[in-house]
């Protein structure tokens, strides 16, 4: 690890997010969704999927964090030492978001993966769709606050900070890189649901992957060690 260049360390963030994308699809593809069908319970569609999918998603969410942590440390060091952004408010917002992501990304996979397992158990025990969805929503209420806060702090803060730093030319990246953030890419992902429900899974993580890819390729040289 010590022999790795700064670019290689930052690229570990892309590896981490690639693992997260796989976990996202295991969690979201063909499971829960929204519908206009008047017969659907609370406008929710739900399907039983194998428990192993959620177990593997949790493992991937947990396993990707060490790689992401290494990438975060290196990227923040580059921004502080090479680009002198330590005192910038936008950078501080960016730093908070990335530090928060180390915990939040593991939580989102482990915490949310419990919900479809509860649904599966409900369907197995009762065979009643409405009752099973109700049980799932009850469990969801216990994690909705930290989930919402994590989303705001991580995805919200990093998007605002990234767009601000790019617009102010604080980083040597082109304006086209503005879109390389989790919120914009997640919004693009919503369009995928018109093709198939759940196809938007992984687009938030893809936004993070693109952000780290841009930073790895543009902020440091190939063999540079900051």
Predicted features by range, described:
Residues 1-226:
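Hydrophobic, aromatic-enriched alpha-helical segments typical of multi-pass transmembrane helices
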């Amino acid at each position: 690890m010590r022999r790795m260049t700064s670019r290689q360390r930052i690229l570990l963030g892309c590896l981490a997010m690639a693992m997260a994308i796989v976990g996202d699809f295991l969690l979201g593809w063909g499971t829960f969704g929204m519908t206009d069908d008047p017969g659907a319970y609370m406008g929710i569609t739900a399907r039983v999927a194998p428990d192993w999918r959620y177990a593997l998603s949790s493992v991937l969410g947990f396993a990707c964090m060490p790689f992401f942590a290494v990438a975060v440390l290196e990227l923040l060091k580059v921004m502080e030492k090479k680009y002198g952004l330590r005192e910038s408010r936008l950078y501080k917002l960016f730093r908070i978001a990335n530090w928060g992501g180390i915990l939040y990304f593991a939580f989102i996979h482990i915490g949310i993966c419990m919900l479809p397992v509860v649904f599966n158990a409900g369907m197995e025990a009762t065979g009643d769709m409405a009752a099973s969805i109700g049980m799932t929503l009850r469990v969801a209420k216990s994690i909705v606050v930290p989930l919402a806060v994590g989303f705001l702090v991580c995805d919200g803060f990093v998007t605002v900070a990234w767009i601000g730093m790019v617009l102010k030319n604080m980083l040597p990246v082109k304006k086209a890189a503005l879109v390389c953030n989790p919120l914009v890419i997640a919004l693009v992902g919503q369009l995928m649901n018109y093709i198939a429900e759940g196809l938007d899974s992984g687009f938030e993580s893809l936004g993070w992957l693109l952000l780290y890819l841009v930073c790895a390729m543009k902020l440091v040289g190939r063999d540079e060690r900051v």
